[in-house]
Design a protein with these regions (language model features):
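Sec-dependent bacterial lipoprotein signal peptides
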Residues: 1-19
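Cyclophilin-like peptidyl-prolyl cis-trans isomerases
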Residues: 16-228
Length: 228
């Protein structure tokens, strides 16, 4: 019975956009570029290591900032950022982290086999920071991003407006949603501590603004985010 409920909840959740509004839907896309070698996220978690050619990154001389999120429960994870693929997105994210914006905020939406979403000061999925940035993805006129929406990849949430992203971001749990490629700005990968992100799924959840069982009953709180 629990398995059936999870499946129903996942189907419901996937009918809503990863955004700061809850009444919008995805448009599907199957286009994605891949490179090799694969990127490995340390820590098995619930879905295994983050080893997939879909989210491989070309090595280059570009500096890759790293951001560490320490959770209130003591666990932590590190995100490596890729400004060569989404420069404005990375700059905005680093600025928010440096300003302490994410400290004390939560992951307000957690969906099994899909993603964990956070960074909303309202904790509802309807808020954000004061600054809006351009959506650096293909359907908004940018070059196709090689970071595919696979396990461990970090991407920006937005509303139906392509240029509405601000502070909300999401972390992918699985490789099953690459249709998001070209529609959302993927800009980083969890390189360590993915098991901590997986642990969010162990939290009891109730009905969220997306109409699915995605809202944690006990808040999943970010104690501190810092640039390493």
């Amino acid at each position: 019975m629990k398995k059936i409920i999870r499946i129903i909840a996942l189907i419901m959740a996937m009918t809503f956009v990863l955004c700061s509004c809850s009444n919008l839907t995805f448009t599907s896309s199957t286009d994605s570029e891949t490179t090799s070698p694969a990127v490995n996220t340390e820590g098995d978690g619930l879905f295994g290591n983050n080893k997939t050619e879909e989210n491989a990154v070309n090595s280059s001389d570009t500096e890759h900032p790293k951001v560490k999120f320490t959770m209130e429960n003591g666990g932590s994870f590190v995100i490596e950022l890729y400004p060569e693929y989404a420069p404005q997105t990375v700059e905005n994210f680093v600025d928010l982290v440096s300003d302490g914006f994410y400290n004390g905020l939560t992951f307000h939406r957690v969906v099994e086999d899909f993603m964990a979403q956070g960074g909303d000061p309202e904790g509802t999925g309807m808020g954000g920071s004061s600054k809006r940035i351009k959506g650096e993805f293909a359907i908004n006129g940018f070059e196709q991003n090689v970071l595919s929406h696979t396990r461990g990849v970090v991407s920006m949430a937005r509303s139906s407006s392509y240029n509405s992203a601000s502070s909300q971001f999401f972390i992918m749990y699985s490789d099953n949603h690459t249709y998001l490629d070209g529609q959302y700005a993927a800009f980083g990968i969890v390189i360590s501590g993915m098991e901590v992100v997986d642990s969010f799924l162990e939290t009891e959840r109730t009905m969220g603004n997306d109409g699915a069982l995605s809202k944690p009953v006990e808040p999943i709180v970010i104690e501190k985010a810092e640039v390493l």
